[in-house]
């Protein structure tokens, strides 16, 4: 049989004398079945297309499945076509709709209802773009982004897309550092007009925080209602002089306290946002944790360690028992810096001496009272002071038992047994 007869039927021969390899589509099989329905014999159809009659009978049994496959493929795949050329992935990523170039300059107005294009136009990045648009819509509804014309009225007509985006990102960074959306406007109004004092330092920000009682930005107080946590009607008005010092209308003692805390701040800027809202004000905790030392006395390491440990135990409610030994070790060392300072012996309490003054050692006594009442018990002293290695021989065990026995009868009995 001539091989050229199979060219119109999409059948190719590998070698002569072999049955031709069939590369028939479901549409070809349906056409062969239709020829049998039209009156042709299965033998003639099988000779024409080059398949056995048994295979043709199997096609007739699966006629419904073959017709369903033809409907699924569609009109483009009825014949045997070459597969489409493969395209690289970066070509799909670079294909953007032409409407993407004509975006509005103020990208805050982009929402799900104001999309200038359908998400189906994007082949790859539709999910990521929808996430970004939803984030913009969420922040816009919650008031996190301030409109550009409110803060910079002179630059209301900015048409550059990148400058607008950088401006909004700077606002977000300012809000996330240490402020709430309500305090941003307060700080903008509180900036001095003179060129000498344009920078507001961190003590001034802490003064503003302690005066206005604004809670710092955290997960807990961000979800609360801002009207509940801001009581601006009961707060006295602030008056700033030319040196940018906060002044009270009727009281002068809080001013001295605030200035003293501003000179020696107890908390850095990095630890301020880490304190959650339910804990008290850091300005109120400062005299309790670390009282102000005189200028001529050098700060000691034990005071700083005691303050840090006490603060840490307050945060965790002193629930860890192993810190009792650390408190005992801290209390055994004297807190005075010079040789003329008073020395504190922890064994004074056991020997009947007077209890040490709380003003001299505030942190050690507070740690001992907070952490463990068993810091100076017999078990702790025996486990830590008895550092000799134990001899496990028979004679040493007997001597240990005789030396540690509390009744004279047992000691006499043990000595008689040894003799």
From Swiss-Prot:
Interacts with itself, dan, ey and dac to form a complex (or complexes) containing the RD factors. Residues 42-62 bind DNA. One of its GO terms (cellular component) is nucleus. SUPFAM superfamilies: Homeodomain-like (SSF46689). One of its GO terms (molecular function) is DNA-binding transcription factor activity. It comes from Drosophila melanogaster. This is Protein distal antenna-related. It holds the Pfam family CENP-B_N. GO terms for biological process: antennal development; central nervous system formation; compound eye development; regulation of DNA-templated transcription; segment specification. Disruption phenotype: Flies exhibit partial transformation of antenna toward leg identity. Ectopic expression causes partial transformation of distal leg structure toward antennal identity. Gene3D superfamilies: Winged helix-like DNA-binding domain superfamily/Winged helix DNA-binding domain (1.10.10.10). PROSITE patterns: HTH_PSQ. The lineage of its organism: Eukaryota, Metazoa, Ecdysozoa, Arthropoda, Hexapoda. It is found in: Nucleus. Probable transcription factor with a role in the retinal determination (RD) network. Regulates ato expression and is required for normal R8 induction and differentiation. Danr appears to repress Dan expression, but Dan is required for Danr expression anterior to the morphogenetic furrow (MF). Dan and Danr lie downstream of so and require dac function for highest levels of expression. Keywords: Developmental protein, DNA-binding, Nucleus, Phosphoprotein, Transcription, Transcription regulation. Residues 333-359, 378-419 are annotated as: Disordered. Residues 15-66 form the HTH psq-type domain. Coexpressed with dan in the presumptive distal antenna, but not in the leg imaginal disk. Both proteins are also expressed in the brain and the eye region of the eye-antenna disk. First detected in early L3 eye disks in cells surrounding the newly initiated morphogenetic furrow. Highly expressed in evenly spaced clusters of cells anterior to the furrow, lower levels within and posterior to the furrow.
């Amino acid at each position: 049989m001539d091989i050229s007869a199979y060219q119109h039927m999409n059948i190719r021969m590998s070698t002569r004398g072999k049955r031709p390899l069939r590369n028939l589509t479901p549409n070809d099989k349906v056409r062969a079945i239709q020829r049998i329905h039209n009156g042709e014999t299965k033998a003639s159809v099988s000779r024409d297309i080059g398949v056995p009659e048994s295979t043709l009978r199997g096609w007739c049994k699966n006629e419904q499945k073959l017709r369903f496959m033809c409907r699924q493929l569609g009109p483009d795949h009825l014949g045997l076509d070459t597969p489409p050329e493969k395209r690289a992935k970066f070509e799909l990523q670079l294909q953007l709709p032409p409407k993407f170039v004509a975006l509005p300059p103020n990208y805050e107005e982009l929402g799900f209802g104001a999309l200038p294009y359908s998400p189906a136009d994007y082949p790859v990045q539709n999910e990521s773009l929808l996430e970004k648009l939803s984030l913009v819509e969420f922040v816009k509804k919650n008031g996190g982004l301030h409109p550009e014309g409110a803060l910079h009225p002179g630059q209301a007509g900015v048409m550059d897309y990148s400058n607008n985006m950088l401006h909004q990102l700077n606002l977000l960074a300012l809000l996330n550092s240490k402020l709430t959306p309500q305090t941003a406007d307060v700080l903008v109004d509180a900036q001095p007009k003179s060129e000498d004092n344009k920078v507001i330092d961190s003590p001034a920000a802490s003064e503003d925080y302690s005066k206005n009682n604004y809670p710092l930005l955290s997960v807990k107080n961000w979800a609360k209602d801002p009207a509940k946590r801001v009581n601006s009607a009961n707060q006295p008005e602030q008056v700033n002089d030319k040196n940018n010092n906060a002044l009270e209308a009727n009281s002068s003692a809080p001013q001295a306290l605030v200035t003293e805390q501003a000179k020696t701040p107890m908390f850095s800027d990095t630890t301020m946002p880490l304190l959650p809202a339910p804990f008290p004000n850091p300005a109120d905790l400062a005299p309790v944790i670390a009282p102000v030392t005189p200028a001529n006395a050098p700060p000691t390491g034990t005071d700083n360690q005691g303050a840090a440990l006490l603060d840490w135990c307050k945060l965790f409610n002193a629930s860890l028992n192993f810190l009792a030994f650390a408190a005992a070790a801290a209390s055994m060392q004297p807190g005075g810096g010079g040789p003329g300072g008073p020395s504190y012996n922890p064994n004074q309490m056991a020997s009947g001496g007077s209890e040490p003054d709380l003003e001299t050692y505030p942190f050690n006594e507070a740690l001992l009272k907070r952490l463990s009442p068993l810091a100076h018990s017999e078990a702790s002293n025996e486990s830590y002071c008895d550092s000799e290695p134990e001899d496990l021989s028979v004679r040493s065990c007997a001597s240990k038992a005789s030396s540690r026995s509390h009744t004279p009868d047992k000691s006499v009995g043990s000595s008689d047994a040894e003799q």
